[in-house]
Regions:
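Flexible, low-complexity linker and terminal segments
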Residues: 2-33, 40, 161-362
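Thiamine diphosphate
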Residues: 2-164, 169, 192, 261-263, ...
Length: 362
């Protein structure tokens, strides 16, 4: 049960049928992210087009056309000349107190690298979420780079949904978490999740105007403007703050309710994102006999990884993109005596998209 459903169920005390408060819609993963952002009360969306991310902006833009001005709960939607400009516009709106979404594909994050990396030091005021569409298999891209690695480099948290419902729910949560920790949050999507459809349970008023976060100063009020000026004396102080935050970000990942840890058999799988769906499809009913850790938030939840490692004799790692989780396992835990199978062992290919057939052949 999502946090929204729990909230409404508690609020009405069971007096109103849930079906009168919620509705189902068949949505692309991109549309789910867009609706999650609008329902989180964003004041703006900025982006640069690029498959597989384009529909996120287009969906918000379409909704924004009927929501009126920002001052009355509407959304400013602007395509930008490039991803760097889009990120800087979104960051400026966040500094002013508004919640803001910025969209781009994975290679677009290269263009936005300067403000992206430095925004981890300046921090944010209103919630700032970067929806990035990775393109494993290079359907319309020049490389397969994995946004999790880039975000790790910048020390910025990543949310990675495995289905359209999680894409909606986790986008809303990402804005709350961004304001809680004062950092931008990356929402990592991949092509198959961006462009596939599934039913998503939405609040009855989904897509309607919200109170403008910008007019309310959003976030935590007005921070010290020196935090936004990264001359060395300020940058050193902000860098120390960012480093001190990392253990608490790991703890937040460990208690994230979207993660799933099930300890059953001696064979286990650590998976994330759409890789979890491929595992379920490949193994079928037998999946109930497997120990499973599904990771939905980064930094990697170390204590959950330790639990499944201690429980299992053999571990499989199924992740779309780079060997991000797999490479962290050895460094985090020193997997002595445990058979670890994944991309490093050649059980899965290191290039191209995963599929249920590839997972079944492991």
């Amino acid at each position: 049960m999502s946090r929204d459903i729990q909230y409404w169920a508690g609020l009405i005390g069971g007096r109103v049928p849930m079906e009168d408060l919620m509705r189902n819609e068949l949505l692309l993963g991109n549309e789910a992210v867009a609706l999650g952002a609008v329902d989180a009360g964003i004041s703006g969306v900025f982006g640069y087009p690029g498959t597989p991310s384009t529909e996120i902006f287009e969906t918000v833009e379409r909704l924004a056309s009927g929501l009126g001005p920002v001052s009355t709960g509407g959304v400013c939607a602007d395509w930008s000349p490039n991803e760097k400009v889009a990120y800087e516009e979104a960051l400026g709106m966040s500094y002013a107190g508004g919640r803001c979404l910025v969209t781009m594909k994975h290679v677009g994050l290269n263009v936005a690298a300067d403000p992206f990396i430095n925004s981890a030091l300046t921090g944010v005021n209103g919630g700032l979420v970067i929806a990035v569409g990775d393109d494993p298999g290079m359907h319309s891209s020049q490389n397969e780079q994995d946004t999790r690695v880039f975000a790790d480099f910048a020390r910025i948290p990543v949310f990675e949904p495995s289905n359209q419902q999680e894409a909606y729910d986790m986008t809303r949560l990402a804005f709350e978490y961004s304001e809680e920790v004062g950092l931008p949050i990356v929402m990592r999507m991949v092509t198959r999740l961006c462009h596939s459809r599934a039913n998503v349970l939405l609040p009855g008023d989904s897509g309607e105007a919200r109170a403008s976060s910008l007019s309310e100063s959003g976030g935590k009020g007005l921070p010290d403007p020196d935090d936004w000026t990264l001359v060395p004396v300020n940058a050193r102080r902000r860098n120390e703050r960012l480093v001190r935050m990392q253990p608490s970000l790991v703890r937040d990942s460990e208690i994230c309710e979207q993660n799933m840890l099930r300890l059953v058999g001696a064979r286990g799988v650590i998976t994330s994102g759409i890789g979890y769906n491929y595992f379920r499809e490949a193994v079928g009913a037998e999946s109930e006999g497997w120990s499973v850790l599904k990771i939905t938030r980064y930094p990697i939840p170390v204590s959950l990884v330790r639990q499944i490692v201690d429980h299992c004799d053999e571990l499989f790692v199924i992740e779309e993109g780079y060997l991000y989780i797999e490479r962290h396992l050895s460094g985090l835990l020193g997997l002595h005596g445990i058979a670890l199978r994944g991309k490093q062992t050649g059980d899965l290919p290191q290039t191209g998209e995963l599929s249920p057939d590839l997972v079944a052949a492991m």
